[in-house]
Amino acid sequence: MPSLRPTLLAVAVLSAGLAACQPQTAPAPTETKATAAAPASDPAVDARLSEISQQWLDGWFRLNPVSATQIGKHDYDAQVDDLSAAGRQAQVDFAKKTLAALDGIDTSKLSRENQIDAAILRNQVQGDIWSVETLQSWAWDPQVYSGLAGGAIYNLMAREFAPMPERLKSATARMQKIPGIYAQMRENLDPARVPKIHAETVAKQNAGILSLIDTFITPNADQLQGEERKQLDDAVANLRKAVAEQQTWLDKTLVPNAKGDFRIGQKLYDEKLQFSLNSSLSRAEIKQRAEGELKRVRAEMYAIAQTVLKDKPNAPEMPADPTPEQQQKAIEAALELAYAEKPARDQVVDFAKQTLAQATDFTRKHDLVTVPNDPVKIILMPEFQRGVAVAYCDSPGPLDKGLDTYYAISPIPDEWTPEQADSFLREYNSRMIHLLSIHEAMPGHYLEGAHSVKSHSTLRSVLRSGLFAEGWAVYTEDMMADAGYLDNDPLFRLVQLKFYLRTIANAILDQGVHVDNWTKEQAMELMTKQAFQQEREASGKWTRAQLTSAQLPTYFVGAQEHFDMRKAVEAKLGDKFNAKAYHDQVLSYGAPPVRYVREMMLDEPIK
């Protein structure tokens, strides 16, 4: 997930956690390369693309300094993004200039790797233009600004990419500029277009930036002396005042006057889906496939229920050909067996550490994929990130070498009642936390990010695909269960399928909400009944579906493309197929959209 911390103009390609770790040894190929027969590329055209890519990277970092810090480009650590009308126009002009340069290239004369880079750069700049001119989230989504303000500090302070005094000086400069972000927010947002849920969420999270100051800045302030210390103290004091003033504006002006529709509608949704996913599947195809998978997976879960409930007292009726009600009751009864095993409310993070070690050992022992040696640290999710996702893998930027990857988990809030906490822990039971560690860390996001850093180009690293990353993470859940994780425990497979049902439901829910005008009741029925989610988890997802769009399907669509690609390569190689060699090769391309990896693996034209 990164997937999934907002910056204004980066479409979803940048949202899935920008990863980089130590390079791995190049994998052995799983096939004989047939590309030698392809026409040779023109070195001059390849060089021209390299020049355009570098110009785009330099300009994009300059225009998006908060994201640049996250990616590991530290020339602009004292700056923040300019979201004024002039700043937005500069973004559009720059993107159009890049697009014109790309139009001047004959892509058929590029190497296959460079054809991919040209395609993903084109998608990015077209998406940037569309985001400013058509989607216009700067005019209606306050999360753009709150995410930028929080990220401006967090991206500087969360990792030791430079000595603390140096980062504190950059933080001082950014804290001086954050009141300007708030001023642009008040200037740009049209309350009539701002959805109520967006306004309320940002009003609740507004003070979260102060917890970042208290966590990262104040305890380290004595590392600056003299005038530099005074500037930092003044910046903190002024920021506290600005946050309080912003809170008043949010509570008294924005929230009461927010009248926008959180549904973006079919036209914007279809366009955003294309830019965000860069997939070969259309919205209609995604829906058809997801609905088919929903039926198939529920049938498989019913078969497991028949096994684990056999001879249990008070087991429900489980005929060979069940009614929908019988299927529902049997699966629910089987899941109850898994829900009963859960950590205490204050032990979630410790248990996650244990599962991470177990999943890592299993992946190594079964030789599923090359496991890197880079450290993974489990941390509590920063306050300003809470409220949307339960956990995410926060990897260092592709240009920051050798730094820690964070596996961030949201603790159970102290104010939750025992009933609320129990609902959460039924969802995040012991087996589910195993799955979360597989998905987010090993061999999911963390491992994928560590492999992807050895990508062939900086552009590929910076524009790594959320579709590839999230799809890989879902694919690995199935891969681990197939390999017999937790001693082939049928309840682990049951919970894994339930976790996959969530992925399926995400894809159906997102277009249901934004295109088909679903009510909360329809959404909750899908999640709590058909996908067996707990009330609290489903309620959080309903909120997320309102606050985001074209991001929830990433997991399902990416997974389908990974499953399809593996089947295609297995069919081509037959007995020569080797899973570890396959996985290492899939991860060797630097996480572009899966469609391009498939074209490379199968020697198909890049298109």
Spans of model-derived segments:
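N-terminal maturation segment of proteins
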Residues: 22-607
